Every structure is written in C-alpha cells, then in structure tokens.
Amino acid sequence: LDTFNWIVNAIVIAGVAYLAFAMALAGWIAGLRRGEAVTLLPARGDGAGTLAAQLGLVLASLVICAVLFYLLWIPLPLAVPPAAAPALAAGGLVIFVAGTLFIVWARRTLGRMWGISTSRQVKLLPDHQLIAGGPYALIRHPMYFGWWTALLGALVIYRTWILVFLLAMSLVVFYRRAR
C-alpha cells in the first residue's frame, strides 16, 4: 500500500508541476518576451521591470498558496475502509490524469493562439483565430473543464478541505471569467 500511495503521489505531483510550470509559467514568460501576453503592469522601456514585477507577483502567490495548503490540508470527515482506499486512490488518479491530459490536449490545440491573461480582459493577438477543433469541438472551455476534472481527481485521492476550497473557488472564478 505504501508503494502504491507513493506512485499515486508522484504522478499527481508530476502532473501539477507540469501544469504549473511547463504550461503556465514558461509559456507566460515566453509570451511576455514576445510582447504577446497581457501584463498586470504597463511596460517600461524594454519590459524588464514588468517581467520582474510579474515574476515577483507569481512567487508571492506561490508562497501564499503553499501556506494555505499547509493550513488547510485537513482531512475531510469521511471514513474510508482500508480495503477500499487503494481503489479510491486509483479511481482518483484516473480522473486526475484524464483532467490533466484534457488540459494538455486543449493547450496544444490552441497552439500559438494560447496566452495567459493576467487581467479581466483577454488580449487577442492581431491574427486571432477562433479554434473550433479538438476538445473545443466538444466543450467551450476545455482547459477549465480539465482543471476542474483534475481537481476532482485530487479530491478523490486526498480528501482534504483545501481541495474542496480550490474546486469551489475555481468553479466560481472560471465560470465568471468564461461569461
């Protein structure tokens, strides 16, 4: 059981790390350098001040999230029979991986049309094209759906209050943003 839990945790951590860094932060920095991403602060000169300020904001947000995770990593009051725990973890892992793969599929389908908006307004590229293939043929906001699915999978695996909070908060925030 310990080896199985370790494998589940390793897959979840690797998936979260990939989504958080490779897709978001790396793409965001590349977009800022190309002048394609929306920024929180107006550009100054060559944009180095903006990039440094935004990276500072990202790092501060990560610290706040780490503190919240530490404080709210409280198990839900759900009794799971020890014999059912591996099946529940495996089911949660399948849901988590499906959500993660859906996000990756949606991101790859967007190609260069993808960018991270750090404001309430989405900045369209000059040669913007509506993407209607891949997962976008199935659902209007597949990256949001994939995120919710991955969070649901993590909730099934770990059953903690922080994941309930994140899922509820992201449902509200993404729903409002999508409208």
Question: What do these predicted ranges mean?
Answer:
Residues 1-125, 129-132, 149-179:
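Membrane-anchoring alpha-helices and their flanking helix-loop junctions
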Residues 132-133, 137-145:
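Histidine-centered phosphotransfer motif of kinases
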